Amino acid sequence: IINIEDNIEFNKLYKARDLYENKTILLKVINHNNHICEDFLANLIDESTIIREINSPYILNMIDVGVDYREDGIWYYMIYEYEKGISLNNIIEGNYLHLEAIISIATQILKGLEAAKEHGMYHGDLNPSNILVDKWYNVKILNFGVTKANHGVNIRSGNNIKYLSPHQLCINYTDTESDFFALGLILFECIFKKLPFGESYDEEQMLKFIDKGINFNALKGINGNEELIEIIKKLLNRTEKYSEFREVILDLSSIMYEKAEIKESLLIEDEQNYKYETKTKVTKNRNKLLLISAIIIIILSALTTLII
């Protein structure tokens, strides 16, 4: 192990060195808990094969999985190809994310989820610690297959239930709707630096928070993000909601298209103003030259008359 890339309790990501292959890798370690089923590892091996078949540029490629029995407990590990970047939760905590960056990150996550769905997969544990982002805002998603390998039950690493959907909390059922809901939470956090329903380690309490809803009127930082907030509302809505990842991608694209149109119109306006100002300046300079020429002619005429 070279260093810790990300450190969430009982859910650690390390930068490590594969001594056999002599290459740098990422190592994800999960501590065993009561939510993890007996055949989890065998199922995870099968899921890792499917993940490799997906071959999406937005999903971090899983090389191997295994288990380590130690005195302090059972630790499952997943070996990934090395990619530079930091987890999205570190970016959210430390930086202001502009609208274009948020939309770019969200679009890439959606494309990864869409590719997985085409292979009959969902994520089921989507949260900022499982999203790797580089300095150009390129995204790689980790932990695909973990929830599915656990028979659709989220493993709740470190008792983290903040990003679970209502039906995951209520009946331990996971599907693509869980990923829509988790993405809504992540996007909300990207804008407001906090989760919409608060935090709790108690599942019943978390459900009560969700049932209470969100008072968007009390939030600061909405200006300029209205269109994105409408998408977030639909992602978190339990009735009028998205059914396809492509729908969300199109809605996000329309925001960027509108921004591009506004920017283009401003550029055209600036260009027109520049041309007008340049033309006005040229006209004024020409008039000045004509006036100076006329004065010179008058002076020369007067001097000629005096000499004669």
Task: List each model region and its residues.
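AlphaC helix of the eukaryotic protein kinase fold
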Residues: 35-53
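Activation-segment/catalytic-loop signature of the eukaryotic protein kinase fold
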Residues: 65
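Conserved short submotifs of the Hanks-type protein kinase catalytic core
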Residues: 71-87
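Activation segment signature within eukaryotic-like protein kinase domains
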Residues: 105-106
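Protein kinase catalytic-loop region centered on the HRD/HxD motif
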Residues: 111-121
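Conserved end of the kinase activation segment
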Residues: 167-177
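Structural helix C-cap motif within protein kinase domains
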Residues: 192-196
